[in-house]
C-alpha cells in the first residue's frame, strides 16, 4: 500500500486536525477542493465534483492537509451527492463551530444531469 492510500485509509474524522484561530477580527476562509470523488450508491460508477468550502471561523480553523484527507475518504464510498455534501457540512460545522459556514458540491454532469448541492448555516426556507 502506498503512503497516500495508507493515510486516507487510516484517517479518522474524530481526530481531524484543527488549529486555534487567534485573529481578533472576523474573516472568511475559502477552500476549493477540485478533485472530490465518491461512488454512486446505485450503480457504483464514480461521481466527480468540485467542493467549495467557505466559513467564518470562531475559535478553530481546519488544517488544510486534514481537510484534504477527509475529502479523499469519500473516494470509494457509495454515497449520494446529497448525502456526501450534507455529511461534509455537518462534520465541519460540528468540529469547527464556525460563526457561518457554506459547503457547495458542484458535481460533473453525468447522463446529461448537472447537480449542485449547497448547505449553509444561514439558509432561509421560503414560505
Curated annotation (Swiss-Prot):
NCBIfam families: QueF-II (TIGR03139)
Family per record: Belongs to the GTP cyclohydrolase I family. QueF type 1 subfamily.
Keyword Membrane applies: no
Primary location recorded for the protein, binned into one broad class: cytoplasm
Entry's localization field: Cytoplasm
Function summary: Catalyzes the NADPH-dependent reduction of 7-cyano-7-deazaguanine (preQ0) to 7-aminomethyl-7-deazaguanine (preQ1).
GO biological process per UniProt: queuosine biosynthetic process; tRNA modification
GO cellular component: cytoplasm
Annotated gene: queF
Species classification: Bacteria, Pseudomonadati, Campylobacterota, Epsilonproteobacteria, Campylobacterales
Top-level enzyme category: oxidoreductase
EC number(s) recorded for this UniProt protein: 1.7.1.13
Name assigned to this protein: NADPH-dependent 7-cyano-7-deazaguanine reductase
One Pfam family recorded for the sequence: QueF
Membrane-crossing residue ranges in chain numbering: none
Organism of origin: Campylobacter lari (strain RM2100 / D67 / ATCC BAA-1060)
Pathways per UniProt: tRNA modification; tRNA-queuosine biosynthesis
Amino acid at each position: 500500500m502506498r503512503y497516500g492510500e495508507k493515510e486516507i485509509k487510516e484517517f479518522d474524522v474524530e481526530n481531524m486536525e484543527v488549529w486555534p484561530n487567534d485573529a481578533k477580527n472576523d474573516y472568511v476562509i475559502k477552500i476549493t477542493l477540485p478533485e472530490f470523488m465518491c461512488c454512486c450508491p446505485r450503480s457504483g460508477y464514480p461521481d466527480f465534483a468540485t467542493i467549495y468550502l467557505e466559513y467564518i471561523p470562531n475559535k478553530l480553523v481546519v488544517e488544510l492537509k486534514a481537510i484534504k484527507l477527509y475529502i479523499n475518504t469519500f473516494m470509494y464510498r457509495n454515497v449520494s451527492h446529497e448525502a456526501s455534501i450534507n455529511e461534509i457540512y455537518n462534520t465541519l460545522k460540528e468540529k469547527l463551530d464556525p460563526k457561518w459556514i457554506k459547503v457547495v458540491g458542484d458535481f460533473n454532469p453525468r447522463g446529461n444531469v448537472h447537480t449542485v448541492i449547497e448547505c449553509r448555516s444561514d439558509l432561509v426556507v421560503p414560505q
